[in-house]
């Protein structure tokens, strides 16, 4: 693709760290800087690194100083991205992993206007779900007409760590730290695999388990009530809340495992049985999301080169745009 893509990381938590590692492992990209609400914390964490770190609120300053081709937005979906996304898309092209499924249409519209008005490209809501799983749902429903794709998450006994839901809990007043694990219901998976497109509610497909560390003065009952009634995140599900110490959280829940599957069962036009199933398992959820984000950064630049502007999702992007291989190489290696 010629010159290396210059990428700024906006927000430096677990996903931001994963994005940094993924950029450094990509031969066609370079990290030009990190922007954060707390640049001093990031500088301290990076130590003697020569990576430039600037205040995310000084948009004119860091876009001028860092000269990024695009920014990968690594903030949370509950409060960060709804505000930061449109604001930043008005200044440069962006990629993000906004994962509040119910709000994606509204977020898309806001990002589309901001990016289109400024001639930028904003790729939104990518990762593995939303993202890869979104694409798998469309493929399954297209290849097996009339089928209903189902998504299941947290297939292991310990469940899968949800970063977005954990972040949403941490934003509740009185919460010091938290982890949220999603568990798939095995009976629901069995029903889907048997065919017939069963009608299943969200609560019949998954349940949620929370491990929360409270501030000293926090009201445990109020926090639990807030969690269980949080729209989109917890309200539709059976949710178990556990209050533990910070030491226990650090020892027992320090990793970031997750995984899931998309299953679609039905019939072909001649009545033959048909089933499509896609599964992924990640040792680190943030590293997985970061890897997908970085591939979409490559696609963003190709869309920009094509003269495109506005918001896009994984559903709008040719798969070849994610790869750093040429068309000839892709045909030879993967076709």
Per-region residue spans from a language model:
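NAD(P)-dependent Rossmann-like dehydrogenase/reductase catalytic/cofactor-binding core
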Residues: 270, 274-335
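Rossmann-fold NAD(P)-binding glycine/threonine-rich loop
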Residues: 98-122
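Oxidoreductase and adenylate-handling cofactor-binding alpha/beta cores
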Residues: 132-149, 167-181, 299
């Amino acid at each position: 693709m010629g010159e290396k893509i210059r990428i700024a990381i906006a927000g430096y938590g677990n996903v931001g760290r994963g994005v940094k590692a993924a950029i450094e492992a990509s031969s066609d990209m370079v990290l030009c800087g990190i922007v954060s609400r707390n640049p001093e914390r990031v500088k301290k964490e990076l130590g003697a690194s020569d990576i430039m770190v600037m205040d995310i609120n000084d948009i004119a300053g860091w876009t001028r100083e860092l000269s990024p081709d695009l920014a990968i937005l690594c903030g949370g979906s509950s409060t960060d991205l709804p505000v930061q996304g449109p604001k930043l898309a008005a200044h440069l092209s962006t990629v993000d992993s906004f994962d509040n499924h119910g709000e994606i249409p509204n977020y898309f519209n806001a990002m589309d206007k901001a990016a289109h008005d400024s001639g930028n490209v904003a790729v939104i809501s990518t990762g593995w779900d939303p993202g890869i799983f979104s694409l798998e749902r469309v493929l399954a429903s297209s290849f097996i007409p009339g089928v209903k794709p189902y998504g299941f998450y947290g297939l292991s006994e310990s469940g899968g760590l949800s970063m977005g839901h954990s972040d949403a809990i941490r934003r509740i007043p009185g919460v010091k730290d938290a982890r949220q694990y999603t568990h798939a219901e095995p009976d629901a998976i069995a029903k889907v695999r048997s065919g017939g497109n069963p009608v299943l509610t969200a609560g019949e497909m998954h349940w949620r388990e929370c491990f929360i560390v409270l501030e000293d003065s926090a009201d445990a009952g109020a926090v639990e009530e807030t969690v269980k009634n949080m729209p989109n995140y917890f309200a539709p599900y059976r949710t178990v809340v556990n209050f533990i110490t910070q030491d226990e959280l650090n020892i027992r829940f320090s990793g970031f495992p997750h995984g899931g599957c998309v299953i679609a069962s039905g019939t072909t036009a001649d009545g033959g049985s048909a089933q499509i199933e896609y599964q992924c398992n990640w040792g680190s959820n943030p590293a997985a999301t970061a890897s997908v984000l970085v591939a979409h950064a490559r696609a963003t630049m190709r869309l920009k080169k094509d003269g495109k502007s506005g918001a896009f999702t994984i559903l709008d992007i040719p798969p070849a745009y994610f790869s750093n291989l040429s068309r000839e190489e892709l045909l030879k290696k993967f076709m």
